[in-house]
């Protein structure tokens, strides 16, 4: 699948460019059944040589319609949430000081869990990202707690962007 090549290319780009700090970030689609294994393997591979820093962005998933066709995603949101939160815990326990993580989430529980883990593990290398116009209350709360927050704006032609934006609205209807 194309995801295999994207994973390998992203890992190689981190090896090449993240020598002094994390410049290149790899996105982990945590709704995929193989995502946690890929994440842990990347940590193990890096720890064996310790010659570059990890840039990691955890998302629940972005290509639902395409990935569903290949039977590679969890069947329920509960399973996806569990896998995502397991990833949050793993990176907060196993990271090096210069590793950098972005948690792209509108999920209050995942954010609260990460804040707890940041404090417990005394790390400061986790930032947050949310879609512009969604979860502004969570973003504001994070900023008030001196956390780094990124707002992103998807772009593209309407035909390609509409399914993504519609799904984001549907998934996050309760928080609007």
Give residue ranges: language-model regions.
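Positively charged, amphipathic and often flexible ligand-engagement surfaces
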Residues: 1-176
